[in-house]
Regions:
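S-adenosyl-L-methionine-dependent methyltransferase catalytic core, i.e., the SAM/SAH-binding region
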Residues: 1-321
């Protein structure tokens, strides 16, 4: 079988249907004269719709960020002629990007944390377990690959990654099988890894689980791209640069992301920080924000029918005080 290899990139090929688009636009409560940040441009679906609602003559402006060079190229093409600036940078450095453009505060910000359809569908990027390709998984296309990780880390560290980032119940068994396999030859492709993962699963689990590699691939992708660390730092720096009354909208796609965002939002929207055993508040704290959504917004039946990748999307919205 031939491996998928990466060809010259065409922005027109970057297909990504923006998830919960109308809900995000409503959540941002866009001021045509405001400054907005999209920290995860992807296919620029959300970015374009935000930019279309801004009035450049009144100072309206969008800053759109992404670490993926393909996404940046796509965003620049699709935002051409609109009041938008596209910067190639990881969201954890959003504050630096804003400051470099002379921007202190934004009136709203959006993060869509899903892997784009383009990244999943382009087998050569190594995110998918359905086609054979180099085991890559790098969003930025720089640094350590998933192949580097599975061929060098100890069984203990691999098991930790699979357990912590993939919530994989068979983490120890899969890690052991990876170590055994690489002693014979390096693990270099996605289907090699998928076969190894399947072989580590009990037969009953293989029969029950149509995609036994899903959790392992998620865990490795998160580890390779340091996604949770980047998300935590990105949330903090974006909140620091959010103007009073500004909205922060975050779309998550798995429980690890959602838990992190939920806890951040709860902390910012809680006034008292005293230990729970204190009978009365003594800290005199004030909430830094208020929750616009008490529970996450999910895709409606029409969107679920039109875009199956929206089924795990959860949108949370916060307003800074």
């Amino acid at each position: 079988m031939e491996l998928e290899t990466q060809a010259a990139f065409d922005p027109a090929s970057f297909e990504h249907i923006p998830v919960l688009l109308n809900e995000c636009l409503e959540g941002l409560s866009i001021d045509p004269a405001g400054t907005y940040l999209d920290g995860t441009a992807g296919g620029a679906g959300h970015s374009r719709q935000i930019a279309l609602r801004l009035d450049a003559e009144k100072g309206g402006r969008l800053i759109s960020l992404d670490q993926d060079p393909d996404a940046v190229q796509t965003a620049r093409a699709r935002l051409a002629g609109l009041p938008a600036t596209v910067v190639q940078i990881n969201v954890r450095y959003a504050g630096q990007a804003l400051e470099s453009l002379g921007i202190d505060k934004v009136n709203g910000a959006l993060l869509d944390l899903g892997v784009s359809s383009h990244q999943l569908d382009d087998a050569a990027r190594g995110f998918s377990y359905r086609a054979d390709a180099p085991l890559d998984m790098r969003m930025s296309q720089q640094g350590e690959t998933a192949a580097d990780l599975v061929n060098t880390e100890s069984r203990e560290e691999l098991a930790r990654i699979l357990r912590d980032y993939g919530e994989e119940p068979f983490a120890w068994q899969i890690a052991g099988r990876i170590v055994e396999a690489r002693e014979n030859s390096p693990i270099e492709t996605t289907l090699q890894l998928a076969d190894i993962v399947a072989s580590a699963m009990p037969p009953a689990e293989r029969r029950k689980n149509k995609n036994p590699s899903r959790r392992t691939f998620q865990a490795l992708r998160i580890a390779v791209n340091h996604e949770l660390d980047a998300l935590e730092e990105g949330l903090d720096t974006i909140f620091d640069h959010l103007a009073p009354g500004g909205r922060l909208c975050v779309i998550t796609f798995h429980s690890l992301e959602d838990r992190l965002v939920k806890n951040k939002f709860r902390r910012w929207s809680t006034a008292c920080t005293c230990p729970p055993e204190f009978p009365v508040c003594v800290c005199g704290g004030k909430a830094k924000a208020k929750l616009i959504t008490r529970k996450p917004i999910e895709a409606n039946s029409q969107e679920l029918e039109e875009n199956r990748r929206s089924r795990s999307a959860h949108l949370r919205v916060l307003e800074k005080c």
